[in-house]
Amino acid sequence: GGTGDQNPVHLMEIFHIDPTIQDYNRKWLALYEGVNRCNQAIRILKGSDYDKKETRIAEMRFLRAHFYFNLKIIYNQIPYFDESVSDPSAFASISNKEYTSDQLWEKILNDFKAAYEGLPDSQPDVARPCKMTARAYMAKVYLFQGKWQECATATDEVINSGKYQLLPD
């Protein structure tokens, strides 16, 4: 047992945030770099005539929601911006108090819902998200919101899809 030599990782896992530990700053930066890349990709894709445009936008919305989900559970009150913010100088003026906690969860959930609607049932590449991946993340958001029935409905859909199973004991 124990935390070994990775105490900052252990502290992050138990939500003991200490701003003097550089791992938290690196995590924050990496997640927001991911958000920004997704936003840039969405802006570019929206202006393209790429034949897989809608699927790729759904993938980017899934990834953006994934990054924001992690930001929300680690840091709680976070700045939120989407693809409509394209000027990097605007980032400094985005407040982490612009949205309530419930509003942030809804924004994250809306991206997962859009991903669920836009993603195919399966993907040719293993690492790409599919419809049930988005639905499973929706269940996680409902769980963090305390919306038990919605969580149960979402998880039942994933389980009953027949595509996934628990590993044997």
What do these predicted ranges mean?
Residues 110-111, 134:
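Mature extracytoplasmic enzyme cores
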